[in-house]
């Protein structure tokens, strides 16, 4: 089963491959393929984030500090790399105070043969984070003293004032190291900011020593001025060497929120616009599913994100009379969530082709050579043989275009198929299109989740069909000496009275039993009433969330017109929906506690 996302890493250095089953294969060369991006040939590592190996699992391979599982699908197919995981690495960390103290800095040690490790920190920063003595310097003049020596050294003892211990300096920025650590002053600009003006580079000269694995707790004194005995501080630095694994980041994170939101999104065509509710309804209706969630990613515009898949020659694509002919002319564009890697691309560039439609990274490329004036194929090399029959052989209107990309054509995709060109998909390409495309299918980017799994999501999900279980009135499930309210009601039944209505006809024991039963009835009625109020409170909370979400959506869509208030020019535009559900639940809990009677026994 192919994964949902295929990612790529471009290689510039090929490493020797050790084909030892069960051991890491350095470089993952068996998953490295020749690809074409425009006219540039590169070596690309192809892997799947989600993949189910139906063949033989061969072990793992390693590339760029990342470990991949390797699958042999069999039947002569190439190996598949999947399930990327960050390889364990060695890290040096500096903490303030203790091993569990604030992390001052960290660095990863790469197996590059270097015999030293460097970390940097700011003297003013460590003083403000963990000084054992009062810091008597806090002016900006102190923070900006970047032209003077910065000291950091073991103090004589924890009981001595810092200013009396400078003669026992072991590590400092103005003398040669006498131990396993060397300190170096980092020159900075005069207009530096707070906690960046007094930076020190701490170099670990022998990182392979066992002392770093257990950790070194170094008592350090710190001061800025090295010209005279001046104010200082006393802190502990804890330096430790760890082996740990960081999760592999698969997707780029926005470095600047404002940079991202200020980017203009392409205007979606009317045919591509869709509401999520309508799409979810269509999905449920088409797939005949119920009692599940239709889930998808964040939608930044008013169109649903789409996913693409290339149509392969061996795919069992149902050919009908309508699919053999081009689809009705349409200039609609579908914006794809991810880009795919094409195996049978068509590509052309040149002065005669002026309408760029997008670029694909391709394993195989049928391209138009403008210099030679003819269409050629290139795969692993420029001299590769073109596939036969052509991938377009099933479509008469496109088959001749595979061999003559420069020939005039309407470039309309067959019914049910699309031209996939990088991050866009088209029903019809422009007459003078330029770029690299494949023929394939697209579908909305969504997945289905059963209701039970939905309860594990991060945001609270309210199940309309599920109610809090309550104690039912059962018979014979109690111990002989236990009398909860339900058993009292079941045993005694309702009270009966004499025909003349005089209570004196009943014995005191009978009346006592009636009071006990009334007490039990009161508790059960209270619990049922409290349960009903809690349901109303939950419903009010859900309505409040829906109203806020709708208002947020309206303000987003009308952002250019200053939201709903600006659109309708409202002077008093307020939205206040207090969530009193928690208060109601607290009140009902007090009522239930007041009416509750513990299970009675014959002994009290």
UniProtKB/Swiss-Prot annotation:
| Residue numbers marked as site, Cleavage | 471-472
Q: Where is this motif: CX6CC?
A: 565-574
Q: Can you tell me which residues are glycosylated?
A: 64, 105, 201, 316, 369, 382, 399, 527, 569
Q: Does the keyword Glycoprotein apply?
A: yes
Subcellular location per the Swiss-Prot or TrEMBL entry: Virion
- Where do we find the motif CXXC here? 165-168
- Post-translational modification (record): Specific enzymatic cleavages in vivo yield the mature SU and TM proteins. Has been mainly detected in vivo as an 65 kDa unprocessed polyprotein precursor.
User: tRNA-binding among the record's keywords?
Assistant: no
InterPro entries reported for this sequence: TLV/ENV_coat_polyprotein
* Main localization (coarse): virion
- The region annotated as signal peptide is 1-22
Q: In which tissues is it expressed?
A: Expressed at higher level in adrenal, sebaceous glands and placenta. Expressed at lower level in bone marrow, brain, breast, colon, heart, kidney, liver, lung, ovary, PBL, prostate, skin, spleen, testis, thymus, thyroid, trachea.
Q: Which domain of life is it from?
A: Eukaryota
* Keywords assigned by UniProt, alphabetized: Cleavage on pair of basic residues, Disulfide bond, ERV, Glycoprotein, Signal, Transposable element, Viral envelope protein, Virion
Its UniProt domain note says: Contains the CKS-17 immunosuppressive domain present in many retroviral envelope proteins. As a synthetic peptide, it inhibits immune function in vitro and in vivo.
The entry's family comment says: Belongs to the gamma type-C retroviral envelope protein family. HERV class-I R env subfamily.
Under the subunit heading, UniProt states: The surface (SU) and transmembrane (TM) proteins form a heterodimer. SU and TM are attached by non-covalent interactions or by a labile interchain disulfide bond.
Any extra detail in the entry? HERV-R_7q21.2 genomic and subgenomic RNAs have been observed. This provirus is intergenic, the closest flanking genes being ZNF117 and FLJ25037.
| Protein's name in the database | Endogenous retrovirus group 3 member 1 Env polyprotein
